[in-house]
Regions:
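A short, charged, amphipathic alpha-helix used as a generic interaction element across diverse proteins
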Residues: 18-41
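A short, exposed loop/beta-hairpin motif centered on an aromatic-Gly-Thr core
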Residues: 10-20
């Protein structure tokens, strides 16, 4: 399936192929060891999760939308 992955910075938005949204979040975690992913919110075809620094400061939000 194709997913649109967005952040607060529109230049970082990408389309990714994945089996499900959890694969995208896990890939993000592997590639960004300095960040923590907070609670995951899912409603219909949209998944959102907050991204925090290792010190607990809010940095960004990932929004994953099924295409």
């Amino acid at each position: 399936m194709k997913y649109a992955v967005r952040t607060f910075n529109p230049e970082q938005s990408v389309i990714k192929e994945a089996n499900n949204y959890r694969d995208i979040i896990n890939e993000f975690k592997e590639n960004n060891k300095d960040f923590k992913v907070g609670a995951i919110y899912k409603q219909d075809n949209v998944v959102q999760c907050n991204v925090y620094s290792t010190h607990g400061l809010f940095i960004d939000m990932l929004e994953i939308t099924m295409q």
